[in-house]
Amino acid sequence: MRPTVLCFSGLDPSGGAGLQADIEAIGQSGAHAAIACTALTIQNSQQVFGFEATSKELLLAQANAVVGDLPIKCVKSGMLGTTDNIAALAEFLRAHPDYQYVLDPVLVANSGGSLGDQATLVKAFVELIPLATLITPNTVELRALTGVTDLDQATQKLFEMGAKAVLVKGGHEDTPDFIKNSLYIDGELAASSTCPRLEGEYHGSGCSLASFIAGRLALGDSLKIAVQHAETWLFGVLKNAETPVLNGQKIPKRF
């Protein structure tokens, strides 16, 4: 059986982000996706209306059900929603130190809607940061996690908090013509990439990127190669994104 990525994330009814994005991106990477649902969200491509989080007990039961049954090589997390779920994931990862782990530190949806109490989640994420093979914050999340405005200083603060590798995504920066991503490993810049900035906004781009990276890691790629493959794939997916009927954020066309 193909190597498996176990995804801890929420269910998005629009199919643009969350678990559906994870499943599609991991499938396109060549790996198999298993899921542990952290929350049922009420959202579309325009906004988040609310969510109901899974209990810690149910979340761990989902994850433990597939351990041993599937060849899990990597864990990926997106929306976790509550501090209990963050604690549950940390407990799971400590029980399985051989799993690689990609942490996408989701605090709000791309549409701006809340996916949990941000201040509380930021404090709880401290427990996950040292457990991650790679953390994939956008610049808004990076500043929120560290409390530091300068991006270079914020990145170094993450390493002081125990990070091993960080992919800083520049899509939220004021660069009208391009987007720059920077990969840091052990506190040093390991690679950077730029791509043209596409028009519009996209629902689930961050989920897709982190999940594709996780899939490639599960298949044995190095961190630098996994990120390179994922960035190339994502740009094509976003170029072909589809616009919803009510003109919300575009849905990446992942297959």
UniProtKB/Swiss-Prot annotation:
SS bond list: C195-C207
GO cellular component terms attached to this protein's record: cytosol
Pathway: Cofactor biosynthesis; thiamine diphosphate biosynthesis
EC number(s) given by UniProt: 2.7.1.49
Root EC class: transferase
Family from the record: Belongs to the ThiD family.
PANTHER family: HYDROXYMETHYLPYRIMIDINE_PHOSPHOMETHYLPYRIMIDINE KINASE THI20-RELATED (PTHR20858:SF17), PHOSPHOMETHYLPYRIMIDINE KINASE (PTHR20858)
Summary of subunit composition and partner proteins: Homodimer.
Name the record gives this protein: Hydroxylmethylpyrimidine kinase
Lineage, highest ranks first: Bacteria, Pseudomonadati, Pseudomonadota, Gammaproteobacteria, Moraxellales
